[in-house]
Regions:
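Short amphipathic alpha-helix that is part of the acyltransferase structural core
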Residues: 1-37, 44-59, 145, 151-169
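Accessory recognition modules or surfaces
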Residues: 89-90, 94, 140-151
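Conserved beta-strand in the GNAT
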Residues: 52, 58-68, 74-82
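Short, solvent-exposed loop/turn elements at beta->coil junctions and helix N-caps
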Residues: 36-41, 132-135
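Conserved active-site alpha-helix within GNAT-family acetyltransferase domains
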Residues: 106-110, 115-141
Length: 169
């Protein structure tokens, strides 16, 4: 099946487009500011783990993995994920996240953590993080705080997630 979009790693030329997509996808600029703060944090940002979907050279979707830790063990935080409203429910988000998770797997990364919609993220293999003994360190609904190994069957470390400072938690 041919799609009108292509998915690829972010380049410096995408920064403005990523901000525009993120602002359009959320009710405030907070998530767009989060992306920029994470990009500026050398301890959180991982080159090659920020992916965009584009149509005719225009960024229409974005997904980001940054470094976090579970009781000191390296892990990844998936957030934020953004799609222009007119491209939502078309497969852009799924394609972008799938490619991004594949890139993490190819790099040999470990666990991936997400605080997100319980009806959406299980399609990628996410399950409640509590099944692995992973906690957020703040109150979140169990079904919305999820984890998965980037490589199926690999261990997920138990403990409390330490997010980069930009997350504010």
């Amino acid at each position: 099946m041919t799609t009108p979009w292509t998915v690829r790693p972010e380049t410096p030329a995408d920064v403005t487009g990523i901000r525009a997509v993120t602002v359009a996808a959320f009710p405030s600029q907070d998530e767009a500011d989060l992306v920029e703060a994470l990009r500026a944090d050398a301890n959180a940002w991982i080159d090659g783990l920020s992916y965009v979907a584009e149509v005719d050279g225009v960024v229409v979707g974005h997904a980001l993995l940054t470094r976090c830790h579970v009781d000191g063990a390296d892990a990844l935080a998936l957030a934020p994920c953004s799609v222009l409203p007119e491209y939502q429910r078309t497969g852009v988000g799924t394609a972008t996240i799938t490619a991004l998770l594949g890139a993490a797997r190819e790099r040999g990364e470990g666990a991936v953590i997400i605080l997100g919609h319980a009806d959406y993220y299980p399609r990628f293999g996410f399950v409640p993080a509590s099944r692995f003994g992973v906690t957020a360190g703040f109150d979140v609904p169990d079904e919305a705080f999820m984890a998965m190994p980037s490589t199926p069957g690999a261990p997920v470390p138990a403990g409390t997630v330490a997010y980069p400072p930009a997350f504010g938690v």
